[in-house]
Amino acid sequence: MSLQAIIYNEDKLLVLDQLLLPYERKYISVSNVEDAFAVIKKMQVRGAPAIAIVAALSVAVGLKHLSEDADAKEYVINSFEHLKQSRPTAVNLFETAKFMQGIALQEGKNCRNKIIQEAERMLVKDLEDNHNIGTAGRKFLLQHYKDKDKLTVLTHCNTGSLATSGYGTALGIIRSLHESGNLEHAYCTETRPYNQGSRLTAFELVHDKIPATLVTDSTVASIMHKIDAIVVGADRVTRNGDTANKIGTYNLAILAKHFGKPFIVAAPFSSIDTSLASGSQITIEQRPPIEMTTITGPIITDSNSRNLEDPKRVRISIAAPGIDVYSPAFDVTPANLITAIATEKGFYTQQTNNKYDFS
């Protein structure tokens, strides 16, 4: 059974609480826009595509419960303005808000059914797009390594079924390679400080029985001789190809460049923000210090981390009290370090000026 981060059925929306993974699976009911804002802000749902889908579906659910005499246009516009504040770096959310608000302005008070249809369409289209992204990335890598049948690939953060409607973007490339028999091995970084790699990506790889190894973020340079390519997702790609993604992505791009290995960004075309000329214009979200200075998990009683004494999670401090904390959620990787960008429309490579052209 495939993992589902989002379950939607008519007027009911459920999201998998990713803060509890990998030890506990619990779905949270999202009944309105405020619920959606909360699960996005708290990172109970994360990943740029999933954030946009949950936001859109929460508005759809709200519209289904909105009284007939209420102003649907005003509701849609105000709801998306509010939701945009939940994660300011995720361009998919902003693009979805712009699109849906445009429909509301065009259709006026009669926008209800159109908004609901478009939100539901997003859920279906995202899954289809993810399969196409996986195929595009796989084809690029196999063309790059014409003399190799099996590749070893490293990924960062979580870009799989838990970050999308299903299959994933960068993890979708790994899945596509695995399905075609072209994956030798996958490596995933733990992705400090929120550990999306060790909690979520490792969980997906084990679930799908994909041969994989978890490594610390600081291990990557020492294993680059084993790695054929690095694949990552994106929260926002600017017009020239600069890419904002989970903190630590920039480090990996520098390593890939140093070792002469392909560095692939995988993202739906909706993650490309052509209104921004370069990465210097991207707003970088700062996370609360407690996410870096503490760690959360269940109590264990043996050295193999397998015997869970109590599934209840506890939070413990791991930093000196009083230390100042700088914890950006994302960094920006310059376009000249990116070998290719895989989208549902195919893959894009650098132009002669080391920049990208998405026209």
UniProtKB/Swiss-Prot annotation:
Keywords attached to this Swiss-Prot or TrEMBL record, sorted alphabetically, are: Amino-acid biosynthesis, Cytoplasm, Isomerase, Methionine biosynthesis, Nucleus
Its EC number is 5.3.1.23
A biological process (GO) of this protein is: L-methionine salvage from methylthioadenosine
Concerning Gene3D superfamilies, the annotation shows:
translation initiation factor eif-2b, domain 1, Translation initiation factor eif-2b, domain 2
Where does the protein end up? Cytoplasm; Nucleus
InterPro entries, alphabetized: IF-2B-related, IF-M1Pi, IF_2B-like_C, Initiation_fac_2B_a/b/d, M1Pi_N, NagB/RpiA_transferase-like
Name the predominant localization: cytoplasm
Catalytic residues as annotated in Swiss-Prot or TrEMBL: D235
The annotated site for Transition state stabilizer falls at: C157
- The enzyme's first-digit EC class, named in words, is isomerase
Give the top-rank taxon of the lineage listed in the UniProt record for this protein: Eukaryota
Question: Catalysed reaction(s)?
Answer: 5-(methylsulfanyl)-alpha-D-ribose 1-phosphate = 5-(methylsulfanyl)-D-ribulose 1-phosphate
GO CC terms: cytosol; nucleus
Is the Magnesium keyword given for this protein?
no
Report the family membership. Answer: Belongs to the eIF-2B alpha/beta/delta subunits family. MtnA subfamily.
Function text:
Catalyzes the interconversion of methylthioribose-1-phosphate (MTR-1-P) into methylthioribulose-1-phosphate (MTRu-1-P).
Q: Which HAMAP family match?
A: Salvage_MtnA (MF_01678)
Tell me the protein's name. Methylthioribose-1-phosphate isomerase
Gene designation: mri1
